[in-house]
Amino acid sequence: MKHPLQLLAFVCIMLTLMACADDRRGGTAEPVHHPANAIYHWKTVYNPTPYEKDFLKKHQIKRLYLKFFDVGVDNLYDGKGEQPVPIATTIFRDSIKHIGDVEVVPVVFITIPALKCAPTLYSLAEHIIDRVDDMCWANHIAYREVQLDCDWTRETKPLFFELCREVRFLLHERRKGLSATIRLHQLRDTLPDIDYGVLMLYNTESLVNPDVRNSILSSDVVREYMRHVEADKHLDFAFPTFQWILWFKDRKFQGILRPGQDTNVEGCLRYEASLYREIIAAKRAIRPCLKDIGYPSSNIIYHLDSANLSRFTDHEISEIYRP
């Protein structure tokens, strides 16, 4: 008969092995995600204005999805041809410490050409995590998850899904999580191997179509997409607050102008804005359709910009964030 201490040691070893096996399968000991008021930062320079810092405090923002960099392609001079490279890296002009107790989620935008030319998706995953680590270390950011953003289609779905598996495996080894943005058209397919998704409720119609009234957000389009959809992952929801001017000439799309830019151009201009009533209508359209896996969803605003956010009252912002 074994000594009680030997039995205790045996049990401890078995529990440790089971935990390690769970790590290899991509499991985590506890969810890395919790519901919170959140907002995106989608600029190449991080330097929030006093208004934007006050917005974070006033509306009790606890999570900031901060775009770190894009993964594009470049022709390298080592004979290897096109290779994935980081581009449009965010420059930090201000310290994250100045926004208080806000969790920062690094976001990486993956271009389709980068997916297609990567030597291996495992090596791409390693490079992404290494760069996120370096940027977090340099800017004193402690992170618990990474988010990938990619406009994948059914054709490129296998590549992006494999990248998600590789990134998630590397993150779960460190007890960190992986999320991904999900566009409405992507809900028709199964979702990638992620811990949760963020459903992007903007750009719901084609901005290049001259006959569309408002391409940013149409609650009718959202309702139609959600009618026959049940997501197989937990989803949070991102709502737009931005505005823009679309330029057409001879019914052909020419480009996007920002409010304040010179609009003395030849052709037709269409002003579009995120409307509060459409945001609330979209919230009502999606809630009954999605699976609850044990914790409530978060509402997220896109994005942290004083010129756009100042168009909304404090009450309207509170209603957008209301569960």
Regions found by a protein language model. Give the residues of each.
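Bacterial N-terminal signal peptides that target proteins for export
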Residues: 1-8
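C-terminal motif of bacterial Sec signal peptides marking the signal peptidase cleavage site
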Residues: 17-19
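Bacterial signal peptide processing site
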Residues: 21-24
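Chitinase-like catalytic core of GlcNAc-active glycosidases
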Residues: 30-42, 67-199
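A structural motif corresponding to the C-terminal end of an alpha-helix
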Residues: 59, 95-102, 134-142, 170-174, ...
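Structural recognition of alpha->loop->beta junctions
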Residues: 60, 133, 137-146, 189-206, ...
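Substrate-binding surface in catalytic domains of secreted glycosidases
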Residues: 158, 162-251
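Substrate-binding cleft of secreted/luminal carbohydrate-active enzymes
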Residues: 236, 242-244, 249-323
